[in-house]
Amino acid sequence: MARNQQLRPFKRPAIRLYPAVNETELIRTLPEVVEFNAQANPDHVFCLQAKKSPNKSILSLVSVTNRQLKQAISQCVGWLKSNLKLQLPSLLHGSVEKGAPVALLMESDIGLFIYEIALIGLGVPVLLLSARLSAPAINSLLQRTSAAAIIVSGRLEATAREAAETLPAAVFSPLPFEAFLSTNEGLPDNDSICHPYHYIDESDRNVLILHSSGTTGLPKPIYVSHRHLLSFVNCHRLDLESEAQGVNVSTLPLYHGFGLVAPALAMGVGKTVCFPPGSTVPSAGATLDLLRISNAASFMTVPSILEDIAFLGDEGIQALAGLDYVTFGGGILKPSVGEELAVHGVKLLNHYGTTESGPLAPIFVPQDDYNWRFFRLRDDLRLQLDEIAPNGNERRFKLTTFPFGLEQPFEIQDQLVCNPDYPGSDFNAVGRNDDTIVLATGEKVQPQILESILCESSLVKSAIAFGEHQFEIGVLVQLAADVPPKNYSKLREQLWPLVARANESMDGHARIQSSEAVLLLPSTVTIPRTDKGSIARKDVYKMFEADIAGVYRKLESAGPVLCLDMETLEEDLKLLISRCTDWPPDWAVTDDLFERGMNSLQAIRVQRALVAAVTRSLRGVCQPERIGRDFVYIHPSVRAMADFFREPVNGLQLPNGFSTRGWAPDQLVQRFALTSKDGRATVLLTGATGSLGSHCLLSLIQSPNIKRVICLVRPEDSFTDPRLRLQKSLESKKLHLSSTQWSMVDVLGCHTASQYLGLTREQYTILQESVTYILHAAWPMDFHWKLPSFQSQFQSLHNLLALARDIHNRRPSIKPRLTFISSIATVGQYARVHGVRMVPETSVDSVECLNPIGYAEAKLVCERMLEHARLHYPHEMTVSYVRMGQIAGSSTTGFWNINEHIPALTLSWIPVDVAAQSITELLLSPAPAELIYHIENPIRQSWHDMLQTIAAVLHLSASDALPWNEWQEQVAAAGDTDNPAKKLQDFFANDFIRMGCGEVVLGTDKARKASATLRRVDAVSEGCVRGYLQYWKEIGWLK
């Protein structure tokens, strides 16, 4: 513990990670820990929040006690209830149901923590977003979690609004944390911040939603439970009060899992946490100031900041050597830096964990026998270590965890080696099983987006990103053909548009900013690969180690090289910074660069460019060595930098007659936005005049997630208005739209098999700029057509797929989803071929599974077209198809199209309005889309009961019922007039018994997982059947 700090009694909350069944009085959630500490340790300081003074050169500390923390959270709860339409948990049919999540995209300070605990206490799931995510990444997480709202700090608002452009999530600006702290005087302490249903049970993982990088390059949501969060509170071996108390400075962002360890220690053992200002990126110098003014006893950070502090020399090392421990994690500390710090008495503590499992290494005060190169595994969690194949003579292990609330174990992708002195407890991660690149900042990069886009080019044979433990990534590109090295510069120019396209979908820290980071390799070089044919990434890095090192040497001296003229110094500096960051010029020379959103990678690029500029234009009056890695952090505005260069102490001589000129703001760059400002989606719908399509239209416009539906309607003739045709079609089906609903519908007359879907170029452009979903429900219903007759249907689907690509190319942040309506007919013979009745939601593996009719063959062709699109264009569109079982009439209006086959011919009817609602839910599902879904009523019904209902309504007696074969004979013998069954005679003879009486059963597991309506579907009721018969009587079809 640091000197001059007094021990204060702290009563620790009783938390057991594996409580006995009968232990019901224990603390279960973080909000309950907050309430316990407010009662048991009210005056103990929970945190010190650093704030910038007005001149931004001096830090002040705001002290927050446990009582104040609880009262601030209570105030935040009130604000949330008043300003957001929160869906609080409620008891429904004996079980608790939660509402949609609320996302937090905020700067990392105590305010973020207050909002997080307030929402958790209300029972509202919290999506915690990194402030470093790109708009496409945020958009993906908002979609996948169905977040209802997003609370956004000011400087992040532009990114958030871009991300939420096509989504229903509302954007809110938070109150600063000071507002909650300044209004809590005199508030009662007995007001609970815990909603009665905020805790459901131990299996509930819809509590806090963190995120990591998924295999597609976009982040994936990670759902964690209350018990998972409590494991942070117990992540220590600080049994002595002298070790447990004192101030713990943490530069770790609170929107990452590692960042939660420090405040959890404050909650669990009373170790006061000190947060840096939320609007700044921590630097070495600022961190040393914070350690000093807070009188810190310990420090938690990432390797890159430790390395920067070590570069400061004795000043930095001595400040660290006086601490009880210095914890680092999220990346690997360079051995040379670690050794230097350890030699000078710094007590380094290696930390380890994953987003899915939480912290796996306890916080403790290292003793002399501890080796900082290894982390020590916790002994209070259920962990499983297994030895795997060695790497040469080095033993390797894999670690399996059992996350709280997760039913299955989680195997960590890192390979571990053990400390020979403590082989059962101390380990180090030496490589990942997956392809994640971990930067020097601890940030992670999934390189698949970059690599796959580059490999699309005919110039490229293979692409492998690199950058492990560096500040930015680069990419090795193996050329597809032999090219003389003298032409490499021209090739880089040709490839750069692809890199720029990839950058648009990658986070800021994961982007390539210079063509110098593209390392070209000849086509003849042998790239190391595994037995499976995949690239052996680590072997590639080793093989080209010298070349990669050369790339980073070039990057150190690369960047925009500008002259700094003392007459125009501010303007020159601003231009340099803008080129390094790609910022538009709508900012002032007095703006704090980090409050504006500069990240650590951009700060390094600016520093490099400044070194080059000083070397080129100011050598002799200012030494480049003065522009250290900390320079941008120390001088975080153009004005501050200019003042530094003008100071005589820095060796600059101002020209005679020089006078500082006032700065005139540049003109704002015009920014173009997508047309939808409220975040709702636009759907392109075909087949809206058909039975299923019309009910899909009604379902879509009733969804709060939909802004507009554009219907492509084939005109009956050159005179009929397409909108009028649609209106008459809906009315014939007893579907009536209000004026408000009609205002959401656009109707375009078209021929979808023609170029641009038969639209004008202007109309097609509108689709490119607005559509986010495509639902293709149009299809001719004729069982006599042969396969060649469906050519126009294949061309229509081709054109819609082309539109999806055009949408993505025009709006790279949008990945449109196209859903095609297929049929049970494509698997009508599945039971005969495979010997099982249940048809899985998989592709057709044999044409023998088809019903032998052109209708089924054509649907299969379209299914195969979609499978091809999913394989070859995974980053441009999402495609799926839905095989429909037998659709009945509407459950509300009784409408059942007399021209569609089999009213009353199948044993598992699903009403058309229910089917349409299920399709809408599959189309708009935030979960990753499956390729294939089935929609069918899983409830099988008795023909005997159904026929009794029909007979009663039609006043038929039992003697009127005929055996199946005899009925077929009468159908065949009767004339064609007034005999609608005659045209389906072949179907009755060949397919009805198999498809209509239970021999073909569509599996619906995937569809029911994504559709709440399909999960709730019931048998068709007697009232429903009476409605169908009544409708047919009304239109004169039944007499």
Swiss-Prot record:
Q: GO molecular function: any one? A: medium-chain fatty acid-CoA ligase activity
In which pathway is this protein known to take part?
Phytotoxin biosynthesis
BP-aspect Gene Ontology terms: cichorine biosynthetic process; fatty acid metabolic process
Q: Where is the Carrier domain?
A: 567-649
Which sequence positions carry the modification called O-(pantetheine 4'-phosphoryl)serine?
S600
Keyword Ribosomal protein assigned to the entry: answer is no
Q: What does this protein do?
A: Nonribosomal peptide synthase-like protein; part of the gene cluster that mediates the biosynthesis of cichorine, a phytotoxin active against knapweed, corn, and soybeans. The first step in the pathway is performed by the non-reducing polyketide synthase pkbA that condenses one acetyl-CoA starter unit with 3 malonyl-CoA units. PkbA also catalyzes one methylation step to produce 3-methylorsellinate. The nonribosomal peptide synthase-like protein cicB, the cytochrome P450 monooxygenase cicH and the O-methyltransferase cicE are involved in the conversion of 3-methylorsellinate into nidulol.
Q: Report the protein name in the record.
A: Adenylate-forming reductase cicB
Q: Source species, please? A: Emericella nidulans (strain FGSC A4 / ATCC 38163 / CBS 112.46 / NRRL 194 / M139) (Aspergillus nidulans)
Kindly list the organism's lineage: Eukaryota, Fungi, Dikarya, Ascomycota, Pezizomycotina
